A protein has these predicted regions:
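C-terminal substrate-binding subdomain of Rossmann-fold SDR/epimerase-dehydratase oxidoreductases
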Residues: 1-122
Length: 122
């Protein structure tokens, strides 16, 4: 399964570009042109926080109960976006920046019981 991410700053840059350039195309898929597997994504997340990844594969539980992505590729053709805006923030860089923001703003983040649900049911 491959996933495709897009940094919010890139989304804002792209919207600004659409508003200022008025391209002929009106419909765009947006995203990072490089997709990653779930394992690659997990490794990048752990790298961003400076931790070692220990992968545990869960057997006997439907994946959809604890993991927000279904078992198919989430990959869009972003050729039209890339033609207008060829440079996007690499996923690893965006993850590191997001983690640093979280560390500096931990008290402002609204916590949800999602992790507790996973702990209680797996």
């Amino acid at each position: 399964m491959k996933l495709q991410f897009f940094h919010v700053e890139d989304l804002c840059r792209f919207i600004e570009l659409l508003l200022t350039e008025h391209p002929a195309e009106r419909i765009y898929n947006v995203g990072n042109p490089e997709a990653v597997t779930v394992n690659e994504w997990a490794q990048l997340c752990y790298d961003a926080v400076g931790a070692n990844l220990k992968t545990v594969y869960v057997e006997g539980h439907p994946q959809y109960r604890y993991f927000c992505f279904r078992d198919y590729d989430y990959y869009l053709d972003v050729t039209k976006q890339t033609n207008l805006m060829p440079d996007v923030k690499p996923l690893a860089e965006g993850l590191k920046e997001s983690y640093e923001w979280f560390r500096q703003n931990r008290d402002a983040v609204m916590h949800r019981p999602y992790a507790e649900y996973i702990d209680a049911n797996i």
